[in-house]
Amino acid sequence: MKKFVMSYSCGKDSTLALYRMIKKGNTPAALLVTVNKEENRSWFHGIPENLIKEVSKSLNIPLILVETKGNDYESKFTEALIKAKDSLGIHSCVFGDIDLEAHREWCTARCNEAGIEANFPLWQENREELVYEFIDSGFKTVIKNVKLECMGEDFLGKVLTREVVKDIKETGSDACGENGEYHTFVYDGTFVEFVAYFLGYKFWYKIITINFKLCIHYSFEISF
C-alpha cells in the first residue's frame, strides 16, 4: 500500500485513475488542484474553487490548492509536490493522462524535481474503452465544456452515457475528448457520494486562448 497525491481535474479521466489506484490498495493522501489565482477557478477545466472544496469534502480526501497566475505554474506545482512528500509521506503523484506525450513529459519532470514517482494508470490504453469502463463502473459525469468547432452546445449538461458517446463520435470528435473537444464534471460514483452538480447551475461562456488559437467554450457555472 502506497500513499499518493492525485492531480485532480474533477473530470472523468482523473476520477477513473483515482478509482483504479484505490482499488489496487493505494491510499490517496490528497487531491492536488491548480487554481487560477485571478479567477478562483481551476486551470484548464474552470471549476470554481468553492465547488472543488465541496468535491474534496464529498470524497473525504484532503485538498491541496495550488494558486498560480500562470507564469509560475511550473514552480508552484513542483513546490506543492515537495511539500506533500515531506508532510504527507507520498511516494507518487497520479495523473489521468492517456496518450499525450508532452503532458507525460511535463508531469514526469515535475515529479523528478520533487523526488517522487509519476504514475499514469491509464497510459496508452484505448480511449473509447476507457470511457466505457468509466461509465460501466457506475460513475456519473456531466459535460460541462464543449469546443464549438467540434461539438454543438446541445451536448452541454448531458450525462455521459454509451449513447451520448456514440453521438459524440458521430460529430467526428474523439470519444474520450482527449483532444479538448469536451470536458466533464463527475458528480456521482460507485465508491463515494459526489456533490450534486445540479444545485443552482446557470449557463455562462468565456473566450479563452489555447495554443494561441481563439476558442469559445460554453460551460456550466455551478454554485451553492
Residue map of PLM features:
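Nucleotide-activated chemistry modules centered on ATP-dependent adenylation/adenylyltransferase
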Residues: 1-224
